[in-house]
Amino acid sequence: MVRPHLLKKKILGRVWWLMPVVLALWEAEVGGSLEVRSLRPAWPTW
């Protein structure tokens, strides 16, 4: 069984690297500038 604190850490890790992707897609949808983007890669690099 997975411990709750480890599961939470795993979920937060996924959300953290997905945020730049979501923001970039949302900016594109509303026709905003794509310049406002995080320098983090849009995929896990471990």
From Swiss-Prot:
Q: What is this protein called?
A: Putative uncharacterized protein PRO2829
Q: Which UniProt keywords apply?
A: Secreted, Signal
Which segment of the chain is annotated as a signal peptide? 1-32
Q: Name the domain of life this protein comes from.
A: Eukaryota
Name its species.
Answer: Homo sapiens (Human)
Q: Where in the cell is it found?
A: Secreted
- Main location (coarse class): secreted
Q: Which GO terms describe its cellular component?
A: extracellular region
